């Protein structure tokens, strides 16, 4: 089997605080983010970090930086798109919706929008989704742990 080198690839990383590079103490940045190491690990690939702390995949009225709302600001010419998010949707009670939903105010509908929009704009690109990391819920904010119910009764 032939392995394709990713060293000449452009990779767009779209996410929340984990992508941004949050250190868990209110600071951080791209220099400590997993994205800053990815390019070197792949032999020099160009890696763009589009992480924003606290952002959600779905649209909610209290913020304007959801993945859906930020999609127009990302690179349409990337070879690979990595979408790493969902923990803020869970912790901030975004409804899941139903599979097949196109409502961008629900998690499933927002994911549908991301997939359709990215693949329409960049049909040659690979699309990778990373699921949120398990959380302990030990935080100064009222955020449930991964194994606790959120206010919608979901885990």
Roles of regions detected by a PLM:
Residues 134-155:
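Substrate-gating cap/lid alpha-helix
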Residues 8-12, 18-109, 144-147:
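Conserved SGNH/GDSL esterase-like catalytic core that processes O-acyl groups on lipids
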Residues 4-5:
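Short, flexible hinge/linker loops that cap or flank conserved catalytic cores
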Residues 84, 130-131:
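Alpha/beta-hydrolase-fold catalytic nucleophile elbow
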Residues 44, 121-127:
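A short helix->loop->beta-strand "cap" motif at the edges of active sites that frequently abuts
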Residues 36-37, 116, 154:
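Active-site phosphate/pyrophosphate- and oxyanion-stabilizing loops and adjacent acidic/basic residues
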Residues 111-115, 150:
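Generic structural signal for well-ordered alpha-helices
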Residues 14-15, 130:
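Short hydrophobic segments within beta-strands
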């Amino acid at each position: 089997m032939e392995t394709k080198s990713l060293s000449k690839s452009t990779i767009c990383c779209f996410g929340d605080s984990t992508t941004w590079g949050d250190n868990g103490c209110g600071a951080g940045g791209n220099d400590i983010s997993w994205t800053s190491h990815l390019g070197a690990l792949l032999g020099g690939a160009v890696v763009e970090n589009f992480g924003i702390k606290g952002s959600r995949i779905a649209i909610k009225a209290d913020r304007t930086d959801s993945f859906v709302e930020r999609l127009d600001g990302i690179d349409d010419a990337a070879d690979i798109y990595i979408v790493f998010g969902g923990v803020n949707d869970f912790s901030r009670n975004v409804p899941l919706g139903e599979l097949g939903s196109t409502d961008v105010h629900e998690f499933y509908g927002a994911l549908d929008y991301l997939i359709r929009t990215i693949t329409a704009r960049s049909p040659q690109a690979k699309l990778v989704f990373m699921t949120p990391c398990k959380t302990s819920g030990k935080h100064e904010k009222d955020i449930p742990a991964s194994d606790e119910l959120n206010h919608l009764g979901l885990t």
